[in-house]
Amino acid sequence: MISHILLDIEGTTCPVTFVTETLFPYAQLALKDFLERHKDDPSISQLINNAEDEWMQDQDKQSATLRHSSEEIQQPKHLKIESYLQLLIASDKKSTALKDIQGKVWKEGYTTGKITSELFEDAYEGLKKWHKQGFTLGIYSSGSVEAQRLLYKYTSKGDIENLFSHWFDTHIGNKKEQRSYTAIASSMACKPQNILFISDNSDECDAAKGAGLFTLYSLREGNPQQEPRDHPIIINLGDVDQWLK
């Protein structure tokens, strides 16, 4: 019996366009100024160091080329890291260091009113209903936990952050690896078969299913991937209830 519902964000509860047309461009434009203003803040300085460590281990050809060229010029560390992070943004790479810093940048945007998140209408309704019915709700996204919380706190219809009990990002593991979902089930103190995972990515659904979770594939209009494979399909979150009985 399903007792826990674990959800992806982009393409599941939130339109892909909000992420690609609002969040990503905002972080890209605000990144340099943010790092300049906060480079001496201990928490941000640590994130800059984390990004540097990640860069040193990045075997991508473009990353290596940028690293070698940056070593030949005299420039503050935060500016070198900014150029690396911009490369990651341009290549849409799933970087934990980038996601952590983006979360800090977005926090400024949300708290100053420059960003308000948009969720699907059926997401508001479904999440509130499931919470009221006693289901334990969790989020698993490549975006940092801080960014996840902000997205649900500053929605156009108010703060719904408190509907969720669990938050997971790539610190627990890659979303396309089975062991990540095993770790999530352990963290939730729940048997894998009691967790329903909903995502718009078939590789993620495959990994979750391999770990023993029940999966639903979010096949929304406008989602970039439309390949459910053998996973049951939902068109919106209103279709989920039939699988909770």
Swiss-Prot record:
Which organism's genome codes for this protein?
Answer: Synechococcus sp. (strain CC9902)
Identify the EC number(s): 3.1.3.77
Q: Provide the GO biological process annotations.
A: L-methionine salvage from methylthioadenosine
Subunit structure, per the record? Monomer.
Family classification = Belongs to the HAD-like hydrolase superfamily. MasA/MtnC family.
Q: By its UniProt entry, which InterPro entries does this protein fall under?
A: Enolase-ppase_E1, HAD-like_sf, HAD-SF_hydro_IA, HAD_sf
Q: What superkingdom does the record give?
A: Bacteria
| Free-text comment on the cofactor | Binds 1 Mg(2+) ion per subunit.
| Pathways involved | Amino-acid biosynthesis; L-methionine biosynthesis via salvage pathway; L-methionine from S-methyl-5-thio-alpha-D-ribose 1-phosphate: step 3/6; Amino-acid biosynthesis; L-methionine biosynthesis via salvage pathway; L-methionine from S-methyl-5-thio-alpha-D-ribose 1-phosphate: step 4/6
Q: Which gene encodes it?
A: mtnC
Per UniProt, the keywords (alphabetical) are: Amino-acid biosynthesis, Hydrolase, Magnesium, Metal-binding, Methionine biosynthesis
Please list the coiled coil stretches: none
Q: Per UniProt, what is one GO molecular function of this protein?
A: acireductone synthase activity
Q: Which reaction does it catalyse?
A: 5-methylsulfanyl-2,3-dioxopentyl phosphate + H2O = 1,2-dihydroxy-5-(methylsulfanyl)pent-1-en-3-one + phosphate
Protein's recorded name: Enolase-phosphatase E1
- Going by the record, the broad EC class of this enzyme is hydrolase
Give the protein's function: Bifunctional enzyme that catalyzes the enolization of 2,3-diketo-5-methylthiopentyl-1-phosphate (DK-MTP-1-P) into the intermediate 2-hydroxy-3-keto-5-methylthiopentenyl-1-phosphate (HK-MTPenyl-1-P), which is then dephosphorylated to form the acireductone 1,2-dihydroxy-3-keto-5-methylthiopentene (DHK-MTPene).
Which prosthetic group or cofactor does it need? Mg(2+)
